[in-house]
């Protein structure tokens, strides 16, 4: 509700403020004489900060619950408290990694922002650092807090988890988390490439404006359709690999892995509305034009980072929905569901992408 309601409110206020201010009244953007400006700034906080945070944290909680529910049917994972808590330890490692990543942004000399063009680069580097450190923490947690072999497929007859039809190793579970981690990074980078002014897709859309609004709309729509191809394949491969080796527990772990860098990705996502509001405050308080130029440069980078956050939210939601479904089926000991074949679901996701 926060995402949808807040998003509609944001865009309605934004478009309304621009139409009334720029087109009808002839006053600049974020001018204090336009009351809709306040609604626009508040809407950014509701839709892009509170709404996105609620969405991602909801997916995070759901993936944690799904992995714990699926793990509860395994006798080996129930043998020790540490084995059962493996999903939560993966999340804890991600939080610690994101905390350490924040020091790279503020304390490492080579990563400090000295020019406008470095803003977007430094934000992207933080995603890389967070993903690498989360990968290392996942390997360590897998080594110490998982048994060498554990049951992942329990037969329909033995509901107490004693009759096992499939086993997985600790390193297979580790691979599932790492696949989710790097699939999330890939989705973020593809989103960055497709929405950043530093790369050719956005530059081509900008150039198409020379021939009119119709061409611009067609170019933008085509770019949006084309941008889903690689993220869909990343999700499909992650689902297939995770399910193939660790069954539904692997899918839940992959979703958890994608969300383990949540602290960093949500911080980067909130950067956009914060800089947008900073520009609005600079305009309303009558600060110098030089200040507005700087906030506009930061806002341009913030628009890209906001798109990266949306990619994370959509990708993680796809994995979490399958993980929750798998948790229900696993706990209910339902075995006759054809959708539970990894190649079937991966093909379903890829097939849904083909019309675009």
Question: What is the predicted function of each stretch?
Answer:
Residues 1-356:
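Hydrophobic packing and interface segments
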């Amino acid at each position: 509700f926060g995402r949808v309601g807040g998003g509609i409110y944001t865009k309605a206020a934004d478009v309304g403020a621009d139409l009334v201010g720029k087109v009808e009244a002839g006053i600049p953007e974020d001018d204090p004489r336009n009351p809709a400006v306040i609604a626009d700034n508040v809407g950014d906080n509701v839709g892009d900060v509170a709404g996105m945070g609620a969405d991602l944290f909801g997916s995070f909680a759901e993936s944690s619950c799904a992995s714990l529910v699926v793990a509860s049917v395994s006798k080996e994972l129930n043998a020790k408290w540490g084995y059962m808590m493996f999903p939560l330890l993966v999340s804890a490692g991600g939080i610690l990694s994101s905390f350490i990543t924040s020091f790279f942004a503020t304390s490492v000399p080579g990563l400090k922002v000295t020019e406008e063009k470095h803003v977007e680069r430094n934000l992207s580097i933080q995603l890389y650092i967070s993903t690498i450190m989360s990968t290392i923490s996942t390997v360590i947690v897998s080594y110490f807090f998982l048994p060498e072999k554990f049951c992942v497929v329990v037969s329909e007859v033995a509901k107490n988890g004693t009759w096992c039809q499939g086993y997985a190793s600790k390193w297979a579970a580790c691979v599932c988390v790492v696949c989710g981690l790097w699939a999330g990074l890939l989705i973020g980078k593809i989103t960055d490439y497709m929405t950043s002014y530093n790369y050719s897709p956005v530059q081509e859309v900008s150039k198409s404006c020379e021939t009119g609004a119709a061409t611009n709309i067609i170019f933008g729509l085509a770019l949006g359709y084309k941008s889903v191809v690689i993220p869909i394949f990343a999700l499909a491969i992650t689902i297939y690999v995770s399910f193939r080796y660790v069954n539904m527990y692997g899918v839940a772990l992959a979703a958890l892995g994608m969300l383990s860098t949540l602290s960093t990705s949500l911080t980067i996502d909130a950067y956009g509305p914060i800089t947008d509001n900073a520009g609005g405050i600079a305009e309303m308080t009558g600060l110098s034009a030089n200040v507005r130029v700087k906030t506009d440069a930061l806002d341009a980078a913030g628009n890209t980072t906001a798109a990266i956050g949306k990619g994370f939210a959509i990708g993680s939601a796809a994995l979490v929905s399958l993980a929750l479904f798998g948790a229900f089926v696993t706990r209910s000991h339902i075995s006759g569901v054809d959708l539970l074949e990894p190649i079937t679901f991966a093909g379903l996701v890829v097939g849904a992408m083909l019309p675009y």
